[in-house]
Design a protein with these regions (language model features):
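N-proximal, solvent-exposed amphipathic alpha-helical segments enriched in charged/polar residues
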Residues: 1-29, 37-40
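Low-complexity, compositionally biased segments
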Residues: 5, 57-60, 107
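Mature extracytoplasmic domains of secretory-pathway proteins
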Residues: 22-74
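A mature extracytoplasmic/lumenal domain signature
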Residues: 34-40, 87-91, 100, 104
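A short amphipathic beta-strand at an alpha->beta junction
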Residues: 60-96
Length: 107
């Protein structure tokens, strides 16, 4: 992929670390990667991967509320910039991904 990783990294809590990934090829998408540590959630890696849909759905709903209400981010959505979020485990297992776009802010 034509991506460049800008390592914030930012610990959101003891279980989740945020990385910002800037996609050079497509200027309309800003990507973020979340690394989730199963142990710090009180789960095994197997339990985390088994419950990945629930975690992905919960994070997506959180981001919809957040991105659509923070004025500077909402402005980016309104001009056609999308946000792509990928979630991986600390052991590099795929957990989920989703995109937030302008249409997600329409009730």
């Amino acid at each position: 992929t034509n991506a460049k990783k800008k390592v914030l990294p930012q610990k959101l809590n003891k279980a989740i670390t945020l990385y910002k990934v800037e996609y050079i090829k497509d200027g309309n998408v800003v990507g973020y990667a979340y690394e989730v540590n199963a142990d710090n959630l009180g789960l095994t890696e197997k339990e985390l991967v088994a419950g990945k849909q629930n975690l992905t759905d919960n994070l997506r709903e959180h981001h919809k509320r957040y991105f659509c209400t923070v004025p500077v981010i909402r402005m980016e959505l309104d001009i056609g910039i999308d946000f792509l979020i990928n979630i991986i485990s600390a052991n590099d297992n795929y957990v989920g991904s989703y995109q937030i776009s302008k249409d997600d802010c329409i009730n």
